[in-house]
Amino acid sequence: MVNSPIVCRFFMALVLTVLAATALKADDVRNGFDVSDALVPTNEIFWGGVRRDGIPAIDAPNFVSPEKAKFLRDWDRVLGVFHNGIAKAYPIKIMEKHEVVNDRFDGQAVTVTYCPLCFSGMTFDTQGKYGHLSFGVSGLLYNNDVLLYDRQTESLWSQIRTQAISGQLKGARIAPIPTAHTTWREWQSRHPQSVVLSFDTGFRRRYGDNVYEDYQRSRDLMFPVSNRSSRYPKKSKVLGVTIDRKTKTYPFKELREHGSSTFVDVIDDKPYTIHWNEEDEYARILNADGDELPSVIVYWFAWYAFHPETLVFEAESAKHTR
């Protein structure tokens, strides 16, 4: 063999180069998704411990009348959606096990989503300029929030960010629809004819079990987040809203101290009405025309992780401006 040491060194260098390229390529793929072009640092995208679709989305939802929804108690929480003149309730005890429901309201495609780690329930119009998108659960998380994926392009979408963070549709936004994270009794009082997502999901799940109970009681998070704040307890609940790219949050602690069930707040010189229901732990925001705006009830840590620039409603300051 001629110049065998040189050949060996060349071969070793080639092997190391291939291994490095393979490692880089592997690092750019998470749970089968290419994140090499992600809008967020890839080291902040975590695997949640389940394969893609290991948490199965519901694609053929079945509903029952309120009279037949005996599996719901007054204080059970639901995601309530009133859209195109139709009211539907999605019990949290079902959403915890599926996180995504691809549904239709009078023919219009929407996707209802829930992230148990962030307490965030959001609904999206999935029939926009990108065509009809249907979603699944990627098994990945960013800031502890579920990363959805659309089955048409396999782009990854951040629920709270309302944006595709990687893939063909990277940077695209998805339009949220007002969603009430409230009790069944409160939702039914406003929408007595609301149908309810039934246990007949096509999957065998124990919908009465709350597997997140220990997590909800704990102060700990499952994964690191990009921004932290100790201003409020991590898992204290807040109402978060984005208006013309400006974010504001209404901590339930501040709403309790404020004491008013209905009051007007001003954002960018425009008045908005806040409705606060302490008994049902529910809040919503309406514009000057009385239209409900998309918002999200979410844990403080999650809202701040995505929106460190957020304005924060303070009860004491609001009292001084009355």
Task: Indicate where each model-derived feature is located.
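Mid-to-C-terminal functional-domain signal that highlights helix-capping/loop sites
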Residues: 24-322
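Bacterial N-terminal signal peptides that target proteins for export
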Residues: 2-11
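Bacterial N-terminal signal peptides
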Residues: 11-19
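Short linear, low-complexity motifs centered on an aromatic residue
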Residues: 6, 22-25
